């Protein structure tokens, strides 16, 4: 068994004061989330976990079930943090210095081919898919295959969470897109 650290974003509750945060924290702790730390930023609820499990996927999926089964709240996990990252966040996750990642991005190091941003590409703070950066670094011998697999699993989990969210929301019921 290993301990996995991750953060879940909760989408259907607004935390407007300390009492709201305390109430939901107590309910989570009384449930199966004694390994969680709860925080609120701009009224959004985030839950940090240090979850023991056989695999990263088991840790995350059980945490999602535990959060969503808390009595008295209809909490819904909308995403796991970390699939889209800045270079600084990618540096934290991979253990490669941000300055080195910036040189890889510019092609100064690494021979080129660094992944392109997937969001805010023309902005000051673009976002990359962590799995793309992890895979590129793995090909260069800079990170482990386990790190790449974890980044990929975050992509898959978030895709499933987003699909569930859209499927259960009437706003999207009549929209069909062919790609």
Which residues are covered by each model-predicted region?
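Short, intrinsically disordered low-complexity segments
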Residues: 34-68
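Polyanion-binding surface elements
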Residues: 81-104
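Short proline/glycine- and acidic-rich turn/helix-capping motifs at secondary-structure junctions
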Residues: 41-46, 76-89
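Short glycine-/aliphatic-rich beta-strand segments at the starts of folded cytosolic domains
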Residues: 1-14, 85
